[in-house]
Amino acid sequence: MGNVAGSAVEERREAAVLPGYERLGGAAPVVYPPGLRERAAEARDVLAAGSAALSEILGVEPPDLEALLVADADWGRAPRENERPYPPGLPYFTRAARPPALVLPETLSSVFRPRTAATGALVLWHELAHAFLLREPLPRTPAWLRELVPQALSAAVARRTGLLLERHLEMIDREPGFTARSFGRHADANGQMAFQNLLLALGDAAVEEFGEGFLRALAHELWEETDVVGEERAQALLADSLGPGGREWLASRPEI
């Protein structure tokens, strides 16, 4: 899941979410099935590093949550808000568990591309960023802004933890046939992945150009919004959070 290491205190006890599952305690607890303890420890370390970084970047305390590493055979029984299970292999954040949980699949879906040493950690940090952002009510926003913030946060965490992104970013298709703003919500899984990758590239470029401070400003602005955020307002929020030169920089970016 990446090369982030940690040393959280370990705890093993029976977990109530799924029968037979145990729990690794620490700053980022992970509930896991028999036979996947090593994977659980790896996920815990990646999440602990991400949680500490996101807390500093956003200026907030980490949310109360734990990760649930689910065996492929148990995927249909994982906690969720919806009646139907999520597609196999797709991580997600849910409040259907107590505490809320990041649900992680034993086998990551093949739709996640590119596959590099950074893929696993980026996926975990992306879902963790959503959990941080959902600590407060968020307004409805265009899809590109809703997903850009966690992608940019993932890139910022990677920079803080020393996870090398160069190879991963080099393998991203920068010309998928659409921009972040023109992307259609009814695209297939491959299109959705191309959309997310485009936003990761844009988010990393923004952090490179303006530093990570704009992410705190943008997140807090979104938490304070009370109305639906339309396209024009979304662009203004992002540009203003970037600071001087933000509007001109955005206008020059092919991704947007």
Language-model region placement:
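Acidic/His metal-coordination segments adjacent to aromatic residues that form catalytic metal sites
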Residues: 107-112, 175-189
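Hydrophobic/aromatic-lined pockets within catalytic cores
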Residues: 129, 133-137, 154-162, 207
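Active-site metal-coordination segments of metallo-dependent hydrolases
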Residues: 138-149, 190-194
